[in-house]
Amino acid sequence: MNEILNTKDINAIGEFFIETWGCQMNEEDSEKLSGMLKKEGYIRTEERENADVIIFNTCCVRENAELKVYGNLGILKGLKSKNPNLIIAVTGCMMQQKGMAETIKKKFPFVDIIIGTHNLHNFPNYLNEVKKKDTSVLKIQEKEDSIIENMPIDRKNSMKAFVTIMYGCNNFCTYCIVPYVRGRERSRTPENIEDEIKKLISEGYKEITLLGQNVNSYGKDLEPKVTFAELLERVNTIDGLERVRFMTSHPKDLTDDVIEAIAKCDKLCEQIHLPVQSGSSEILKKMNRHYDREKYLDVVSKIKKLIPNVALSTDIIVGFPGETEKDFEETLSLVKEVEYDSAFTFLYSIRKGTPAAKFEDQVPEDVKHKRFNRLVEVVNEISAKKNKAYEGKIEEVLVEGTSKNDENKLMGRTRTGKLVNFIGDKDSIGKLVNVKIIKANSFSLTGEEI
């Protein structure tokens, strides 16, 4: 495995600010950037105006994320003119797209560092280069390297942590840019994953979320091969670990042994995120999802049979090219049949460089928005019903801190991922406690510690 390059000669130490768009993988990348900079002696600030180094970690899964980057970069021009020594860096998936780095440099020439997803570990070197030579750096590494282990990481949460088990994606869904910007699938060894988790437990962490673009493909590239189910069983035996979650699962690869592992491993939470994207077999075929409606519902049926109290969540794209009213109605009926606890719903947006961008039968924007609103209404109605079923029950909650809405209350999550605001003892923060659910709200639960 490659080791991170180490530098200790950055001249003046100052403050840095990181803004992150996108998924949990991006969040963990930002934690690594923060870890590297803190190791160099920098201090993190939450105020852009105070920073000596500003880093934007970008996303390109949807157009909206890109527009936010453009808007925020425009704002930085004023900060740069006030403080010429300010160093501005842009990284992440958006920069990994073909020609994007050059576009950013042309539109925003005041940006000092532009790098992609594959050379993030060298960020301190690039920063050093800019400071020493008074130059700019534009380095996009097109091919992914082997996995970099032992990177310093500055985690935002003191009791829950992301642990990446694999990088990249081999699925090539027609709407998705991820395989082009994150590279092919590469799995970490189970030993390295276990070592990271054990270190986190020694630091007081209670809950781990195993991350990958498609965790069910884990281990196929390792020698000897290791299945995701085997990894789950190994992680479940680690002493001191209280809870394990994972995301994201691809329905085509969610095998019976994984479902069985979740059912029998006591530390694995009864929560599965299973993106369906559409309820129409015709649209799923156009998306290149490698399953149809029937296969998806079959997987859901197996999950519910083995894990009766499971909480299911999903991703749904509305307005994919060629989606008819009939296709959309099939999505609505699937949502009603599965009864998701929650769903992340998105309007389809064209991603340049993907096959779907060239599809001619694009759905009009007004139609997309009407369908989206109808879907959200159904999803919210089901979510409220699922939450209502918790009233009167006693749930195990990992207490994360005080409630955002009421500092006199505590907040945490159930094993099924439900957010609970409750009256309790502040000494319980960081612990697992039993909470009686008194009231269900649209997107959270209210309770009291018992």
UniProtKB/Swiss-Prot annotation:
Q: What is its EC number?
A: 2.8.4.3
Catalysed reactions, semicolon-separated: N(6)-dimethylallyladenosine(37) in tRNA + (sulfur carrier)-SH + AH2 + 2 S-adenosyl-L-methionine = 2-methylsulfanyl-N(6)-dimethylallyladenosine(37) in tRNA + (sulfur carrier)-H + 5'-deoxyadenosine + L-methionine + A + S-adenosyl-L-homocysteine + 2 H(+)
Task: Recall the GO molecular function terms of this protein's record.
Answer: 4 iron, 4 sulfur cluster binding; metal ion binding; N6-isopentenyladenosine methylthiotransferase activity
Q: Which PROSITE patterns match?
A: MTTASE_N, MTTASE_RADICAL, RADICAL_SAM, TRAM
Give yes or no: UniProt keyword S-adenosyl-L-methionine: yes
Q: Which prosthetic group or cofactor does it need?
A: [4Fe-4S] cluster
* Protein family: Belongs to the methylthiotransferase family. MiaB subfamily.
What the entry lists under NCBIfam families is as follows: miaB-methiolase, MiaB/RimO family radical SAM methylthiotransferase
State the name under which the record lists this protein.
tRNA-2-methylthio-N(6)-dimethylallyladenosine synthase
What lineage is this protein's organism placed in? Bacteria, Bacillati, Bacillota, Clostridia, Eubacteriales
